[in-house]
Amino acid sequence: MDKILYDALTFDDVLLVPAYSNVLPKETVVKSRVTRNIEVNLPLVSAAMDTVTEAELAIALARAGGIGIIHKNLSIDVQARHVAKVKRFESGIIRNPITLFEDATIQEAIDLMLRHSISGIPVVERPTPEGCLLLKGIVTNRDLRMTTSSNEKITTIMTTDLITAQEDIDLLAAEEILMQNKIEKLLVIDEEGYLKGLITFKDIQKRKQCPDACKDMHGRLRVGAAVGIRSNTITRVDALVEAGVDVVAVDTAHGHSQAVLDMVATIKEKYPELEVIAGNVATPEAVRDLVKAGADAVKVGIGPGSICTTRVVAGVGMPQLTAIMNCAKEAAKTDTPIIADGGIKYSGDISKALAAGADTVMMGSIFAGTDESPGETILYEGRRFKAYRGMGSLGAMSEPEGSSDRYFQDASAETKKYVPEGIEGRIPAKGPLDEVVYQLIGGLKSSMGYCGVKNIEELKKNTRFVRITSAGLRESHPHDVMITREAPNYSTSH
């Protein structure tokens, strides 16, 4: 067997070849799939990293049209709360609204509103054995401001003269009722007066602001969450499912391992309807085995990330473009989407990844600098930066719920001596996520215009690459000039 198989390429090694086009960038469609059954309006996924994706960024990305994957360096309860926060941020009809019983106190209402960042709570009778909740009233922030005693029952201040609607109401009719009655919340009941949901004026406004938002069938923003291969993983999945998660990602550095295959199969056996992403991998054989285990999408990328040191610490990996092409060819046999994870520096790299066969791209560093990311903001020499670290860094692996299992290292070891496969650093602050997304998608649409393709599927099928030299790469970047004003989509820091 030959030891050296073939040359492998990454994004900087190639360019897409321009073609005849009658397609304008504004006419292109960038919808895609993140798993077999989950569509996204933008082919962007945020990485499950503790300096990248928590609820705030996941909300912003889903509203833009992509999807965020909440990292797992959190306790089970906290990670589930992040998922629930995304799912409750925007809804058509809130099907399981938070409620209070009639004997609750005003202080309990205050605590509940603060904990869940809500401004109104339906009040119901204690449930029947069948679990039905008979609506009795509603208590809002306005009611709470009118009282000074927090120990009184909420029945003393709640509104009982209620404006309600039936379950079959559409949002246009709901908006009209809300405006006519000058109220912010419309309670949805059945014919017997049992609470079935809640429609808020704020949710209707949010839908208008973000028409391309990535939502589930109930009008809620979509969100994913990472899980590992620890003994408590199924308990974590249980909590995430209860919180309403749309997809879980079995997230490891080496997805082609028996522990990952077993975990994917176990999750799918317990939750056959739950979408499961598995990874990371770099070979067709790995894709085949993960799909056979039950994966609904496969994440590709061994070591391409800017903060990843796997390729130099372990000497293992695959240049990302070749990895995507090899894996996508195998995935196409079972109609399984590929997520290209890592190595994206510019919007042009997104185009190359999709043209190579990926359905979406997962990014960490590009999103880590945004206002919505959870990384610490750092001031250095008069400039704003945000902390960014790999999940294989010492800091990330040493957290109480750290990522050591992602790299198959024992979290219970007394010495806590890990072998890191990532670093900790800082990146320039980039401002709001929606501005970053605008530039990324603008670059992708421009690429599609140059290539004469109208959608992602055509980008995958009807494009060609040309290999370039190091001189060609230098020529591709600005040269023989001193940049006096940086563009919003190009930086010399890469």
UniProtKB/Swiss-Prot annotation:
Catalytic activity: IMP + NAD(+) + H2O = XMP + NADH + H(+)
CBS domain sequence ranges: 93-154, 158-217
Co-factor requirement: K(+)
Binding site for K(+): G303, G305, C308, E475, S476, H477
EC code(s) of this entry: 1.1.1.205
GO MF term list: IMP dehydrogenase activity; metal ion binding; nucleotide binding
GO BP annotation list: GMP biosynthetic process; GTP biosynthetic process
Residues annotated to bind IMP: S306, D341, G342, G343, G364, S365, Y388, R389, G390, M391, G392, E421
Active-site residues per Swiss-Prot or TrEMBL entry: C308 (thioimidate intermediate), R406 (proton acceptor)
Keywords in alphabetical order: CBS domain, GMP biosynthesis, Metal-binding, NAD, Oxidoreductase, Potassium, Purine biosynthesis, Repeat
Family: Belongs to the IMPDH/GMPR family.
Name of this protein: Inosine-5'-monophosphate dehydrogenase
Gene: guaB
